[in-house]
Regions:
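Nucleotide-activated donor-binding/catalytic signature segment of Leloir-type glycosyltransferases, i.e.
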Residues: 243-257
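Nucleotide-sugar donor phosphate/pyrophosphate-binding loop at the beta->alpha transition
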Residues: 65-69, 104-107, 114-137, 150
C-alpha cells in the first residue's frame, strides 16, 4: 500500500520524531512518503537521509487555503492508496484534500489532546466543531493514549471510530557507549564532575521547565554535593525567558536548540526531569528510561497505564520546585549509575507498534473513488 503521511511541521518535536521512528519500522509492504505543510526542520532532513520522500507544501499561516489544491494535486498525481495525518492543522487540510483526490482510506493520529486543549492551545467550541467536521472525513482516528481516546469520545467522536495505538520506542537506539557520553559532555561544555539535570521538549510554558530552574537554584544554595548544570534539549518561544530566569537565579543552563540526536544528549545527562502536567503520552520519560537514566516526572499517561513495577527507575512528583529540589538533592549525592531498560520500555517496543499500524492499514484497505463534490463532504 502506498501511504502519504501529512504532518503540520517537521521540527524536532515528540510527534514528529515519533512519525520518523514509525516509518523506519513499518513493514516493507507499505511504501510511505511525507507531506509537510510548513516548517520542515531537522526531522525532514533525517527522513530524507533515510530515503523517504518529503514533499514541502510551503503553507504560509493557518488560513493559507492555497495549500489545499497543492496537497490535493500531490495526492491525486502520486496515486496514494491511503492518507494518514498528524497534528491538528494537517488533520483539517489533509483529510479534506484526500477526499477531494478520491482517497477514502483516510486516518489521523491524535498526538496531543486534552479536554480543553489541543497541542497546547485552548480548544473552544468553534475549534471542537471544526475538528469534528474534519474527523468525519476520515475512517478512523488513532489515539496515542487512553487519555487521548477518552477526550476524543468526550468531544463527540463515536467509540467505533477511535483506535488506541500508543507511541513506540526503539530501546536499542539509546544504548550509547560511555566514551560517547564523555565526548558529548565535552562538546556541550559540561564539566566532567558536574551533576547534569536534563529535560527534553519544546520550550513552551506547558512543559514547566521554569520549575527546574527554580529547583536547581535551590539546590545550589544547599551545602555539599557537586556543581550542577541544567541541560535543555529543544527550541521554542520560552527560550529567552528561561535563559533570563537562569541568569537571575545563578543557574548554569545549556540550551542545545533543536536537535535530532536525542539519545546522545540523554547520555550526557545524570537524570531526566519532566515536570509537565499536560502530557498525553510521555514519550520523553520513556526515552530517559531507555537511556538508563533515573527519571523524575509528573505527568506520564504511558506509565500510569501500567503497573507500579513497570518503571522502577521513574519517580512521580508534584510539579513544584520544592518536590524536584528534594528529589534531585537525593540523586546528586548518589553515585552516577545507568539502569537497565525497564519493562515499560519493552511494552512500548516500536516494532510491535509499527506492526499494529501496518495491520490497521491492511484492515482499512486501499480504496479509491472519483473525487466527490466538496459540498457532499460535510453532509
Amino acid at each position: 500500500m502506498k501511504v502519504l503521511h501529512v504532518v503540520t511541521g517537521l521540527a524536532a518535536g515528540g510527534a514528529e520524531r515519533q512519525l520518523h521512528l514509525l516509518l523506519r519500522h513499518l513493514p516493507d509492504r507499505h511504501h510511505c512518503e511525507v507531506a509537510v505543510l510548513t516548517n520542515p526542520g531537522t526531522v525532514a532532513e533525517a527522513l530524507r537521509a533515510d530515503g523517504f520522500a518529503v514533499h514541502e507544501l510551503d503553507m504560509r499561516g493557518n488560513r493559507d487555503l492555497a495549500v489545499l489544491p497543492r496537497l490535493t494535486r500531490l495526492i491525486r498525481t502520486r496515486r496514494y492508496h491511503a492518507v494518514h495525518t498528524h497534528l491538528y492543522r494537517a488533520g483539517l487540510y489533509g483529510r479534506l484534500a484526500a477526499r477531494l483526490a478520491g482517497v477514502r482510506t483516510v486516518l489521523a493520529t491524535e498526538h496531543s489532546l486534552h479536554p480543553g486543549m489541543i497541542e497546547g492551545r485552548p480548544a473552544g467550541r468553534g475549534v471542537r466543531a471544526l475538528y469534528l467536521a474534519a474527523e468525519r472525513l476520515g475512517r478512523t482516528t488513532v489515539a496515542v493514549s487512553g487519555q487521548v481516546a477518552d477526550t476524543l469520545r468526550d468531544w463527540g467522536v463515536p467509540e467505533h471510530r477511535v483506535h488506541l495505538l500508543p507511541n513506540g520506542i526503539d530501546a536499542a537506539g539509546y544504548a550509547v557507549p560511555a566514551a560517547r557520553r564523555t565526548a558529548v559532555r565535552a562538546e556541550l561544555g559540561l564539566p566532567a564532575g558536574a551533576f547534569t539535570v536534563g529535560a527534553v521538549g519544546r520550550l513552551v510554558p506547558g512543559k514547566r521547565f521554569a520549575v527546574l530552574v527554580e529547583a536547581l537554584a535551590a539546590l545550589a544554595a544547599r551545602p555539599g554535593g557537586p556543581e550542577t548544570r541544567l541541560l535543555l534539549v529543544g527550541e521554542g518561544p520560552e527560550r529567552a525567558a528561561l535563559a533570563a530566569q537562569a541568569a537571575r537565579a545563578g543557574v548554569t543552563a545549556v540550551f542545545t536548540g533543536e536537535r535530532d540526536d536525542v539519545p546522545e544528549l540523554l547520555a550526557a545527562m545524570d537524570v531526566l526531569a519532566a515536570p509537565s502536567t499536560e502530557e498525553t503520552f510521555g514519550l520523553t520519560v520513556l526515552e530517559g528510561l531507555a537511556a538508563g537514566l533515573p527519571v523524575l516526572r509528573t505527568a506520564c499517561p504511558a506509565l500510569d497505564a501500567l503497573g507500579p513495577d513497570a518503571a522502577p527507575g521513574a519517580r512521580r512528583l508534584p510539579s513544584t520546585a520544592e518536590a524536584y529540589t528534594e528529589a534531585l538533592d537525593a540523586l546528586r549525592t548518589a553515585p552516577p549509575r545507568r539502569l537497565p531498560p525497564p519493562p515499560a520500555v519493552h511494552h512500548y517496543d516500536i516494532a510491535r507498534i509499527a506492526a499494529e499500524l501496518a495491520d490497521l492499514y491492511d484492515r482499512l484497505g486501499p480504496a479509491r473513488t472519483a473525487a466527490p463534490r466538496p459540498a457532499a463532504l460535510w453532509a
